Design a protein with these regions (language model features):
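Glycine-rich phosphate/pyrophosphate-handling loop used in enzymes and phosphotransfer proteins
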Residues: 1-209, 214-263
């Protein structure tokens, strides 16, 4: 018996008496197809389905009809070409992101990145970026949280796709107030000039990665900054997308979450 077979048998014996637990709810994973999450938690993730806007992934309230560009993207086209999301910012996915982002449950980076990778493959199967770039935190916020959740997801995507991740390309050059509770215009004013690039680009395709997209203001500002320094096509990948009709409740929740981490 070789070493790999022996390890497999030992692991199987351990699993028999100590079944692997779900990283999110800690229940036995059972026959789940995911190596980290149980079937119950996987079933609680609400996928982003048609109809939605292919540019910003905004879900539409109507059931019928296909995907089409939303009114905001028609009137003010963003500097990114498309957006993909692992699911809606509701129920289990919302809880998972909260655990990952605010409770320090960093082991969720890989299962969440797998979900996002699957969504990316579905949205843009033939699109490969030259660089994966996470939305940065301001150094002050980074010192409070000690990690950038967008960077952790970006690294997992880069590892699985063999694509370089550049965490120093896009930086936040000034602190901003919390976005929660701000109107779209206030959000834009709050973030305008907050991001800069550390070097020029030469037409590289960029995948911009963030955790949650609410109004899309952050992605718009970042993509504009990337294009301003010579980036080629920019795509956006987020763990979750908020519904427009749920933004009011989302703002209230995010306000509380921001207070929990000290503003």
């Amino acid at each position: 018996m070789n070493w790999s077979n022996l390890c497999a048998e030992v692991n199987g014996f351990i699993d028999l008496f100590f079944p692997p637990a779900c990283l999110l709810c800690h229940a036995p994973r059972g026959e789940s197809p995911d190596p980290s999450l149980c079937t119950h938690c996987l079933g609680g993730f609400l996928p982003l389905t048609s109809p939605c806007c292919p540019r910003c992934a905004l879900p539409f309230a109507t059931i019928g009809g296909g995907d089409h560009v939303c009114g905001e993207c028609l009137l003010q086209p963003p500097a990114f070409s498309w957006t993909t999301a692992a699911g809606l910012y509701e129920e289990t996915l919302r809880h998972a992101i909260h655990r990952f982002k605010f409770d320090g449950c960093l082991v969720l980076d890989r299962p969440l990145a797998r979900l996002l990778d699957t969504a990316w493959q579905r949205t843009a199967p033939n699109w490969t970026p030259d660089l994966i770039v996470p939305v940065p935190l301001h150094p002050r916020r980074l010192s409070q949280r000690t990690y950038n959740q967008a960077l952790l997801i970006a690294r997992e995507l880069g590892r699985s796709r063999q694509i370089p991740v550049d965490a120093q390309l896009l930086v936040r050059v000034r602190p901003t107030v919390a976005q929660a509770g701000l109107t779209a215009r206030e959000r834009h004013r709050n973030l305008l000039g907050a991001f800069a690039l550390t070097r020029p680009l030469s037409g590289e395709k960029i995948l911009l990665v963030d955790d949650v997209m609410t109004t899309g203001t952050t992605a718009r500002i970042c993509a504009t900054a990337l294009h301003g320094e010579g980036a080629g096509e920019v795509g956006v990948a987020v763990l979750a997308r908020a519904r427009r009709n749920s933004l009011l409740g989302l703002e209230t929740t995010l306000s509380r979450e921001v207070e929990e981490i000290g503003g």
